[in-house]
Swiss-Prot record:
InterPro entries: MS5/SDI1, TPR-like_helical_dom_sf, TPR_rpt. GO terms for biological process: cell division; male meiotic nuclear division; meiotic cell cycle; microsporogenesis. Residues 13-47, 309-329, 393-434 are annotated as: Disordered. Disruption phenotype: Sterile plants with abnormal formation of polyads during microsporogenesis, tetrads with more than four pools of chromosomes, after male meiosis, due to an unusual and abnormal cell division without further DNA or chromosome replication after meiosis I and II, and leading to collapsed pollen in flattened anthers. Chromatin recondensation and stretching after meiosis II characterized by a dense microtubule network connecting haploid nuclei in the tetrad stage rearranged into four bipolar spindles as chromatids recondense, as if haploid nuclei entered a third meiotic division. Residues 142-166, 408-434 form a coiled coil. It is found in: Nucleus. Residues 411-423 have a biased composition (Acidic residues). This is Protein POLLENLESS 3. TPR repeats lie at residues 95-131, 133-164, 191-224, 241-274. It comes from Arabidopsis thaliana. GO terms for cellular component: nucleus.
Length: 434
């Protein structure tokens, strides 16, 4: 029998028609309207308390969780350090516990303790966390002023990158730099380490090594911060034109996102301030160079002449025969020259000159030609006086000259002849008296 016939209503009876079917589904209740299930005290993992999400602390009740709670919620860093030690000894998330403890020690000014803790317990950490531990160790070295150890660690990191073991064989890696997550390649990481090495050697006054590291870093990646630091390095080596050229390039470069970076602005201001300070001292240095240019002693000191070679030119000068004779009246010296415009002083000794004497009145001739004031009296000379002095100096300079220079033997013979003549005259006087 057909099933439709069985469902027919008897005569005089009518069935209520069924509701029309639609394809619409019932909307889900929003999460804010739902009731939370009751908490279960048996298992903490089943709790859905957002407290750890709001305060950015891990959930649970382990030594590391208690240490983070003391650090971030209770704001008790000393208690947090002791709890981090407990977590490290218990083996509870040793990587995070060691790094967080070192950060807290750095904030408390206990960087040396943080360095020793990392060196003692980093072997317990995984291989993947060693790079971040090295970065934290570099910050602690910088904070505590241990620049030499920082340079050694940076050299080790650079060598690791050059051997291809820095990123675990990968070409790029996501890193957190200055609070931002960035994708950094091996070349960018190498440039960053070279820049840090240049800055460390700049603090150690190794300016040549610092320049090499900065130029290598700029060859990998152009960075304005490194350009400013390289300019500072060149100024330390007295290469001012090159430093000014670099600063001009930085100033004239187009505005980029890097221009608003705080380290770049600080480096540029520091370099400009140092350049202004050097240029302010430059006129004084030029004046002192001009003042000491004619000083033979200063020139000799600049040439680094040894003490024994100062009088080497005079070592072959023979001594006067009269100096070895017992009855000699004194040494032979040149006659004292008259110096114009110079005050006479009593008891002035004659100076023995071996060099070529300057023309008489050369300095005074220069003064008169320039028409300058008289050095000692500070009076302006009139034109008649200047003409008179010109004639006087010229006549004196063209005075009688010796026909020829006499040797020491001729001088000795003349002295002996004079003594013999004196003895003969004294003998004649004695004979006449008798």
């Amino acid at each position: 029998m057909c099933p439709c016939v069985e469902r027919r209503a008897p005569p005089g009876v009518y069935y209520t028609p069924p509701p029309a079917r639609t394809s619409d589904h019932v909307a889900a209740m929003p999460m804010t309207e739902r009731r939370r299930p009751p908490y279960s005290c048996s298992s903490s993992s089943e709790r859905r308390d957002p407290f750890h999400i709001v305060h950015k602390v891990p959930s649970g009740d382990s030594p590391y969780v208690r240490a983070k709670h003391a650090q971030l919620i209770d704001k008790d860093p000393n208690r947090a350090i002791s709890l981090f030690w407990t977590a490290i000894n218990a083996g509870d998330r040793v990587d995070s516990a060691l790094k967080d403890m070192a950060v807290v020690m750095k904030q408390l000014g206990r960087s040396d303790e943080g360095i020793e803790a990392i060196k003692s317990f980093r072997y317990l950490c995984s291989f993947e966390s060693q790079d971040s531990i090295d970065n934290l160790l570099l910050e602690l070295y910088k904070k505590s002023g241990r620049i030499e150890e920082e340079a050694v660690l940076l050299e080790h990191k650079l060598q690791t990158l050059e051997q291809g073991m820095g990123f675990g064989g990968r070409v790029s890696r996501a890193k957190r730099v200055q609070g931002k997550h960035v994708i950094m390649t091996i070349e960018q990481e190498k440039a960053r380490i070279l820049g840090n090495l240049g800055w460390v050697h700049l603090q150690l006054h190794n300016y040549g090594i610092a320049e090499q590291h900065y130029r290598r870093a700029l060859g990998l990646e152009r960075d304005k911060n490194k350009l400013c630091n390289l300019a500072i390095c060149l100024m330390r080596m007295s290469r001012i034109p090159e430093a000014k050229s670099l600063l001009d390039d930085v100033r004239d470069s187009p505005a980029e996102s890097e221009c608003g970076d705080e380290p770049f602005a600080k480096s540029y201001d520091r370099a400009v301030e140092m350049l202004a300070e050097i240029e302010s001292k430059k006129p004084e240095a030029d004046l002192s160079e001009k003042f000491y240019a004619g000083c033979s002693f200063v020139n000799r000191m600049k040439e680094n002449i040894a003490p024994g070679t100062a009088n080497k030119n005079y070592s072959d000068v023979s001594s006067s025969p009269a100096s070895v004779r017992p009855n000699s009246a004194g040494l032979y010296t040149q006659p004292r020259r008259c110096r114009l415009f110079e005050e006479e002083t009593r008891g002035a000794a004659r100076k023995l000159l071996f060099g070529k004497p300057q023309p008489f009145g050369s300095e005074q001739m220069k003064i008169l030609e320039r028409g300058e004031e008289e050095p000692m009296k500070r009076k302006k000379l009139d034109q008649n006086m200047i003409q008179y002095l010109h004639e006087f100096v010229k006549d004196t300079a063209d005075g009688p000259k010796s026909e020829s220079k006499k040797s020491w033997a001729d001088i000795a013979e003349e002295e002996e002849a004079e003594e013999e003549e004196e003895e003969r005259l004294q003998g004649e006087l004695k004979t006449a008296e008798m």
